[in-house]
Amino acid sequence: MMKFKPNQTRTYDREGFKKRAACLCFRSEQEDEVLLVSSSRYPDQWIVPGGGMEPEEEPGGAAVREVYEEAGVKGKLGRLLGIFENQDRKHRTYVYVLTVTEILEDWEDSVNIGRKREWFKVEDAIKVLQCHKPVHAEYLEKLKLGCSPANGNSTVPSLPDNNALFVTAAQTSGLPSSVR
């Protein structure tokens, strides 16, 4: 299903959730510093770059496109961290890990809307995100709890849509760390 808005097309899955994609953009493969961008609605707040998927677009491609537009970075797309559900906003977001290899001086959102970007230590990013975007903080919490390459745990495999791993705020607390 698709809905058209001026200069954007929104796509939805079978259950009516908006299909989104995002990346946790790391400065290095150690995944200790993450790039956040200023919110377009609240420029003094920080968010994880991401947005709606376009028709026929694969989640990984959408995630790479969104970080290029919003954060002005290119990089090596890594693993799918999970698919996060936001029941309030009716969104499902595919969240990937990306290691930044190129940082543009000027990029689409910096020129058009004055968007900023900044590197944060993961712990600091979680604190910043918990106030304004707790769902985004969950991405980093999940990374810390079981998907970091530094802790020896296995990574979450990419799954086809019909076998997708969905994580909601209510579900994470009771799950073993190997699946959070």
UniProtKB/Swiss-Prot annotation:
InterPro entries: DDP-like_NUDIX, NUDIX_hydrolase-like_dom_sf, NUDIX_hydrolase_CS, NUDIX_hydrolase_dom. The modification N-acetylmethionine is found at residue 1. A motif (Nudix box) lies at residues 51-72. Keywords: Acetylation, Cytoplasm, Hydrolase, Magnesium, Manganese, Metal-binding, RNA-binding. Mg(2+) 2 binds at residue 66. Binds 3 Mg(2+) or Mn(2+) ions per subunit. GO terms for molecular function: bis(5'-adenosyl)-hexaphosphatase activity; bis(5'-adenosyl)-pentaphosphatase activity; diphosphoinositol-polyphosphate diphosphatase activity; endopolyphosphatase activity; inositol-3,5-bisdiphosphate-2,3,4,6-tetrakisphosphate 5-diphosphatase activity; inositol-5-diphosphate-1,2,3,4,6-pentakisphosphate diphosphatase activity; inositol-5-diphosphate-1,3,4,6-tetrakisphosphate diphosphatase activity; metal ion binding. It holds the Pfam family NUDIX. Its main location: cytoplasm. GO terms for cellular component: cytoplasm; cytosol; nucleus. Mg(2+) 3 binds at residue 66. Residues 18-144 form the Nudix hydrolase domain. Its cofactor is Mg(2+); Mn(2+). Expressed in heart and, at lower level in skeletal muscle, pancreas and kidney. It is found in: Cytoplasm. Its EC number is 3.6.1.52, 3.6.1.61. GO terms for biological process: adenosine 5'-(hexahydrogen pentaphosphate) catabolic process; calcium-mediated signaling; diadenosine hexaphosphate catabolic process; diadenosine pentaphosphate catabolic process; diphosphoinositol polyphosphate metabolic process; intracellular signal transduction. It catalyses: diphospho-myo-inositol polyphosphate + H2O = myo-inositol polyphosphate + phosphate; 5-phospho-alpha-D-ribose 1-diphosphate + H2O = alpha-D-ribose 1,5-bisphosphate + phosphate + H(+). the additional CAG codon in the isoform 2 (DIPP2beta) mRNA introduces a single, in-frame amino acid residue (Gln86) into the protein. This insertion engenders the DIPP2beta protein with 2- to 5-fold lower catalytic activity than isoform 1 (DIPP2alpha) for the diphosphoinositol polyphosphates and Ap6A, while granting activity towards the Ap5A. Belongs to the Nudix hydrolase family. DIPP subfamily. Cleaves the beta-phosphate from diphosphoinositol polyphosphates such as PP-InsP5 (diphosphoinositol pentakisphosphate), PP-InsP4 (diphosphoinositol tetrakisphosphate) and [PP]2-InsP4 (bisdiphosphoinositol tetrakisphosphate), suggesting that it may play a role in signal transduction. PANTHER family: DIPHOSPHOINOSITOL POLYPHOSPHATE PHOSPHOHYDROLASE, DIPHOSPHOINOSITOL POLYPHOSPHATE PHOSPHOHYDROLASE 2-RELATED. This is Diphosphoinositol polyphosphate phosphohydrolase 2. The gene is NUDT4.
